[in-house]
Amino acid sequence: MKKPYTIGLDIGTNSVGWAVLTDQYDLVKRKMKIAGDSEKKQIKKNFWGVRLFDEGQTAADRRMARTARRRIERRRNRISYLQGIFAEEMSKTDANFFCRLSDSFYVDNEKRNSRHPFFATIEEEVEYHKNYPTIYHLREELVNSSEKADLRLVYLALAHIIKYRGNFLIEGALDTQNTSVDGIYKQFIQTYNQVFASGIEDGSLKKLEDNKDVAKILVEKVTRKEKLERILKLYPGEKSAGMFAQFISLIVGSKGNFQKPFDLIEKSDIECAKDSYEEDLESLLALIGDEYAELFVAAKNAYSAVVLSSIITVAETETNAKLSASMIERFDTHEEDLGELKAFIKLHLPKHYEEIFSNTEKHGYAGYIDGKTKQADFYKYMKMTLENIEGADYFIAKIEKENFLRKQRTFDNGAIPHQLHLEELEAILHQQAKYYPFLKENYDKIKSLVTFRIPYFVGPLANGQSEFAWLTRKADGEIRPWNIEEKVDFGKSAVDFIEKMTNKDTYLPKENVLPKHSLCYQKYLVYNELTKVRYINDQGKTSYFSGQEKEQIFNDLFKQKRKVKKKDLELFLRNMSHVESPTIEGLEDSFNSSYSTYHDLLKVGIKQEILDNPVNTEMLENIVKILTVFEDKRMIKEQLQQFSDVLDGVVLKKLERRHYTGWGRLSAKLLMGIRDKQSHLTILDYLMNDDGLNRNLMQLINDSNLSFKSIIEKEQVTTADKDIQSIVADLAGSPAIKKGILQSLKIVDELVSVMGYPPQTIVVEMARENQTTGKGKNNSRPRYKSLEKAIKEFGSQILKEHPTDNQELRNNRLYLYYLQNGKDMYTGQDLDIHNLSNYDIDHIVPQSFITDNSIDNLVLTSSAGNREKGDDVPPLEIVRKRKVFWEKLYQGNLMSKRKFDYLTKAERGGLTEADKARFIHRQLVETRQITKNVANILHQRFNYEKDDHGNTMKQVRIVTLKSALVSQFRKQFQLYKVRDVNDYHHAHDAYLNGVVANTLLKVYPQLEPEFVYGDYHQFDWFKANKATAKKQFYTNIMLFFAQKDRIIDENGEILWDKKYLDTVKKVMSYRQMNIVKKTEIQKGEFSKATIKPKGNSSKLIPRKTNWDPMKYGGLDSPNMAYAVVIEYAKGKNKLVFEKKIIRVTIMERKAFEKDEKAFLEEQGYRQPKVLAKLPKYTLYECEEGRRRMLASANEAQKGNQQVLPNHLVTLLHHAANCEVSDGKSLDYIESNREMFAELLAHVSEFAKRYTLAEANLNKINQLFEQNKEGDIKAIAQSFVDLMAFNAMGAPASFKFFETTIERKRYNNLKELLNSTIIYQSITGLYESRKRLDD
């Protein structure tokens, strides 16, 4: 008889815990065969384990390398096209000129022609370098001279311009003749005063006076931030977040955020240097009005003048080649300053002369010019050298202005706009076309080599198929800047670009999402927010708005006002509903959503009757889509022509100038396509009219009484005909979480194969912390920087009075002290920084309702303040006393909006029974789409058979569980999790997931729709909306394990018995567990990318085929694909066979796998034979069960798991939590101090047997003896850190009683040759062994 079993999964980003358990809560156990070289032919194994693996990485590095390759290739192509244009004429002048240029990189004896790169003779070469010390000398001469020049010189100048053509940050024409910062800043001030004339008249804004000091500040070599601060000081009364400050931010090159100054709903950042500046500005002007356009033009002109002033340093009348002349001036100044510096050093610091001017290893001039020294390091070195030396003021002043000994090629050359280079190119062509007619004929082609960029919607010009390209051709042949429109189908490529760029709906993975500015999407956002807004009438009755009222609000407010405020809604209630003193709940000062696109389209001239007519919905949605996808005005114009029969030319012209950004999360089909089977209404229909219930989107799609949930499940991508790899690849989510999902699916497949039949239940838990996004990781980085900025804005001196650092701020107690500006959050009294352990860390929303240990839910307060607050959010009395202070913290960025809302929740009725039920429900029921996707894949893999009526037959229950339930279970029964001890906790969690899920569904079968994927009960097991009943029910679920000794159903079946706890505890103490680290054949880059200089090193890899590293340098540190153990013959007369480990690099892998024997013979091995292939993390076992994992061909990692008795795990749990406010953990470790000696004895015994780091162990024992009577908190932290000593994996250094214990590295791999290699399946249930000492 097949016994039912459950698979529990705990899925993470670098681990998957799994467990297979019976109905009686024990693990399945079997004797499993061991194949290969093993004395034991079978081992009894518990069916639980952990799959460990390296976290999946994003493709960011690959993408950057690909982008760099394309950029370099396109640069080479531009030069090649220029040579093609010059080829015929150049062959008449110097037939070998281009050959010599292409050979110029090679060493002399490998060049095909003359060893001189430019000219055939040494005399010409010397003459050229004498006349033109830099390329800019040549460019300037050709721009200013009308005489005929050598064609080779013309080519060299044009090639330099085209190769380094400048940036495209400033679009359109650039007025290089007018770079007077002072004059243009005056124009900006005049425009500012004109635009804000009405504000100046009514006193809300001040009239600004021109200040000559501003121009001086703008051109100074100081940071943008310092420029902004100094300019604002010249205008007293102007605030850093004010209107004027934002325009000055634009001018100095920073972001201007106009959200607050213009009172906008969304953040509105624009930056002059950004490619998208024009589009961003148009979007902003659409919100604030075109009357501000002239002011932004004035600000952009001022910004351009500042940029150009930093590049062009020569007077306007001196030359027509201002850029080249400025570079020549930089060269001449460098030469003069260098002469003066040398003379000064010889006179005042003769002993330093050699170091500064000859030693390239130092940060002196030699290192700066010929070594790797950066400008900042050179300046720092020279300043330190010259300080306090009489007469060095001149040099130090230039260093401080960053204008000392500047090189020709510097980082700020990236700021040179392409228009400056273009101006010189056009001048050279104009001067020389008189003598070389082909230049005139090809003028546009040559110019296009500077100005042309491949349109973004065309994408890479791939040859053949490419996973990154979507280009559609009109005609075959080579694509050039001047023929691209003949060769490429812009329209079709643009459509394909739309498809490629559009994201998929979170809920309906086949559907494209709507643009963020879609009228339909904005309508959904408005109604989704409005449906949860309540009002209290004059009689004190609280009501939601009816469907009719919502429609009226939408038409009378949102269609009339771009931004709807709370006071507008109050006025509406007074006028329409005759409520004299309404109180609005569920809304701050204004709505977050708006119907802004409607107003934009009205403004460009589309009539209201067109906008309001449902017949035009599709047209209007298409218009918004075009304006979102395309940035190119010509492309927008072309795409909009399809609507010319409805919209006139004037309207279309205005639409061309508009551009939207951003995409929503939902599709049109989700909002308006799928319909409830009974009512035939869409989700948007319900949002507009859901009288009595007023459900929002999440409630509608999760409501068991509606069919949206089942429709969404059926719409999920089918997995029937796809392999697991491609199924997971199609999921929305990070590469890290996808890798975990893929591993978990493979584990389930193997477990089902071993068991021989499917499980009754599969329980899936995905911990939230395992879905950390890039943003999340950034947010968790060092706290000091953000704190310092916020404290400064807040105007506090607390960081100066009590300095701290990132290490200290990891302590939440101290971090909260600074975030609260040293004040008790509930009482306002000063906190004593020296006695922070005496205060409580309080959860604003109590832990009994929500497991939220984030800073957003924590405050530091006295015990008295905590008691006054009680087991609820802060009462109204505390809110009224402290709200002003909390608002200051919120405005000063020391508190998030979420935290402020938690603290002030009493103003909005406090924690209602419905809130409490919702908080607890949120901890129980998994709502994340990524988890539902995993459940869907498992559901489709096992529940694919249909009954006679076509309904899915459910063979396997797929249960999604949240970690809160298992956490509660662990807490109640002291089954403590200490992650630092070993990796067992992943499998423990998987096992407990199975225990909790099975028991819950036995005791509360009505919970199946909440937990089991694909279950829909078409009734509400809480009649009406009894929030109190729901809250009590959910609370009981969280606590029933502790409250009930035995639960029996009506048939007498025991559903839960406390004796089962003994089984659970026994299982949790099992020592045998299958830990498997995923072996990896390494792929990717061949070696480190850094090119090493030429040298007599056999280790260097040639940069290209036939490039001798001794002549051209090379690459080092080749990356290993895997290692191999080989056997080969040694000796002359008598052959002796030896074994050796060698690495096969990623670069060599293909050749090795093609013919292993030939490859090894080429390496010099006689009669070679491959004994074993060893990918990274291959596991091998030495004497007494000591295990290691291969890290590289010459280093290993620890391979054993340390297991501690339960009482020592309990000790470590309390040690890790001794800072918690209730003091229980601190009391525990204080009263069990002597147990730390026992813990150390266990660690020492394990280390002597497996870790083998004797010197470190002796040091650890000595430190313990010296500190064992010391501060108990220091002991606790030291022993938590000590767990790293024996942890499986790469050795790591750690601190023990503030002393660093350095890592012990395992570099001697000779023992591997006498070990047993262990090959494991993904679960570790199957294994085979191979002895290498035979």
From Swiss-Prot:
Binding site for Mn(2+) 2: D10, E769, H986
A Pfam family this chain is assigned to: Cas9_PI
Protein name: CRISPR-associated endonuclease Cas9
Function: CRISPR (clustered regularly interspaced short palindromic repeat) is an adaptive immune system that provides protection against mobile genetic elements (viruses, transposable elements and conjugative plasmids). CRISPR clusters contain spacers, sequences complementary to antecedent mobile elements, and target invading nucleic acids. CRISPR clusters are transcribed and processed into CRISPR RNA (crRNA). In type II CRISPR systems correct processing of pre-crRNA requires a trans-encoded small RNA (tracrRNA), endogenous ribonuclease 3 (rnc) and this protein.
Record-annotated active site: D10, H843
Residue numbers binding Mn(2+) 1: D10, E765, E769
A Gene Ontology biological process term: defense response to virus
Biotechnology note: The simplicity of the Cas9-gRNAs RNA-directed DNA endonuclease activity may be used to target and modify a DNA sequence of interest.
Organism this protein belongs to: Listeria innocua serovar 6a (strain ATCC BAA-680 / CLIP 11262)
Magnesium found in the keyword field: yes
Protein keywords: Antiviral defense, DNA-binding, Endonuclease, Hydrolase, Magnesium, Manganese, Metal-binding, Nuclease, RNA-binding
GO function terms (MF aspect): DNA binding; endonuclease activity; metal ion binding; RNA binding
Domain comment quoted from the record: Has 2 endonuclease domains. The discontinuous RuvC-like domain cleaves the target DNA noncomplementary to crRNA while the HNH nuclease domain cleaves the target DNA complementary to crRNA.
Gene (UniProt): cas9
Binding note for cofactor: Endonuclease activity on target dsDNA requires Mg(2+).
Obligatory cofactor(s): Mg(2+)
EC number(s) reported in the record: 3.1.-.-
